[in-house]
């Protein structure tokens, strides 16, 4: 994988930094694992904007990813690595011995031709998935479930990983990249290794249009709006906003705590690093 800085042949190319991976499949994705993906423009069923800065972008198909890794005891071979427009990580097309194909997240170091497996009898090897009760303490894993059988929810983006730091009874303790320590049931599954494409963070789009290709619209400052649109809006000439920073709905920002799910507080051993 190479990080390439483009020549400044135009203002739009001057600041572009690309991450090029020659191992990725250059053809079409596997048609049997594609789903339609409709654009909402950030609107809900009533037509109102519920997510700001969303709209436009290139047409995409959703890739059906196997986050459960529940095909136990059947060896599989990685056919190829692919680009996925729906996530920062790359994905791998896996062919099982019984003929079924599935997409999984591509782990760091994973290559076409590698053998992987799921289940308690799988060996400790990058790309293999098993319950946390069978994973040695100190191991680095990704694609971790929070509820058994629900599918991976933790450490799914490019370069992400968590470390298993303890196991006590029905729960395993994980250290997340943010510094948070969290308890997860030992029957939850995880995959060995870290997610690939860690160089994604070095990418620079270089121009506003590249954001628009991805369906991301501009973010307008509140002080540049009218009073009807934002608490910071209005005033003659340039202003500072006239109050402590708030969201468009008046909720304080800049460090204001908004977490209210007390039901799951008992699973957080240590809060993330501020």
Swiss-Prot record:
CC annotations in GO: cytosolic large ribosomal subunit
Keywords: Ribonucleoprotein, Ribosomal protein, RNA-binding, rRNA-binding
Keyword field contains Ribonucleoprotein: yes
SUPFAM superfamilies: Nucleic acid-binding proteins, Translation proteins SH3-like domain
PROSITE patterns cross-referenced by the UniProt entry: RIBOSOMAL_L2
Pfam family of the protein (one): Ribosomal_L2
Sequence segments annotated as region (Disordered): 223-274
Alphabetized SMART domains for the sequence: Ribosomal_L2, Ribosomal_L2_C
Superkingdom of the source species: Bacteria
GO molecular function terms noted in the UniProt entry: RNA binding; rRNA binding; structural constituent of ribosome; transferase activity
GO biological process, one term: cytoplasmic translation
InterPro entries assigned: NA-bd_OB-fold (IPR012340), Rib_uL2_dom2 (IPR014722), Ribosomal_uL2 (IPR002171), Ribosomal_uL2_bac/org-type (IPR005880), Ribosomal_uL2_C (IPR022669), Ribosomal_uL2_CS (IPR022671), Ribosomal_uL2_dom3 (IPR014726), Ribosomal_uL2_RNA-bd_dom (IPR022666)
Protein family: Belongs to the universal ribosomal protein uL2 family.
Subunit structure: Part of the 50S ribosomal subunit. Forms a bridge to the 30S subunit in the 70S ribosome.
Described purpose of this protein according to its UniProt entry: One of the primary rRNA binding proteins. Required for association of the 30S and 50S subunits to form the 70S ribosome, for tRNA binding and peptide bond formation. It has been suggested to have peptidyltransferase activity; this is somewhat controversial. Makes several contacts with the 16S rRNA in the 70S ribosome.
HAMAP family: Ribosomal_uL2_B
NCBIfam families, per the entry: rplB_bact
Protein name: Large ribosomal subunit protein uL2
Organism listed in the record: Shewanella oneidensis (strain ATCC 700550 / JCM 31522 / CIP 106686 / LMG 19005 / NCIMB 14063 / MR-1)
Organism classification: Bacteria, Pseudomonadati, Pseudomonadota, Gammaproteobacteria, Alteromonadales
Gene: rplB
């Amino acid at each position: 994988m190479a990080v390439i800085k483009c020549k400044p042949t135009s203002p739009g190319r001057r600041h572009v930094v690309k991450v090029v991976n020659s191992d990725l499949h250059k053809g079409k994705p596997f048609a049997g694992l594609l789903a339609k993906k409709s654009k909402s423009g950030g609107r809900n069923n009533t037509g109102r904007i519920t997510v700001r800065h969303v709209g436009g972008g290139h047409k995409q198909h959703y890739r059906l990813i196997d986050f459960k890794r529940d095909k136990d005891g059947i060896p599989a071979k990685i056919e190829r690595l692919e680009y996925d427009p729906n996530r920062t990580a790359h994905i791998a097309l896996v062919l099982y011995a019984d003929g079924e194909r599935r997409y999984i997240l591509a782990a760091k170091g994973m290559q076409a031709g590698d053998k992987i497996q799921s289940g308690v009898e799988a060996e400790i090897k990058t790309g293999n998935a098993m319950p946390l009760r069978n994973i040695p303490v100190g191991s680095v894993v990704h694609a971790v479930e929070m509820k058994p059988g629900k599918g991976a929810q933790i450490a799914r983006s490019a370069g992400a990983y968590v470390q298993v730091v303890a196991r006590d009874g029905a729960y395993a303790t994980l250290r997340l990249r943010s510094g948070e320590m969290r308890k997860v049931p030992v029957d939850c599954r995880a995959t060995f290794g870290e997610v690939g494409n860690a160089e994604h963070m070095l990418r620079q789009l270089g121009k506003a249009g590249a954001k628009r290709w991805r369906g991301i619209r501009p973010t307008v400052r509140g002080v540049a709006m009218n009073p009807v649109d934002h608490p910071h809006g209005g005033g003659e000439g340039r202003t500072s906003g006239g109050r402590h920073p708030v969201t468009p709905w008046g909720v304080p920002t800049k460090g204001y705590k908004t977490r209210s799910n007390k039901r799951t507080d008992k699973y957080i051993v240590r809060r993330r690093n501020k």
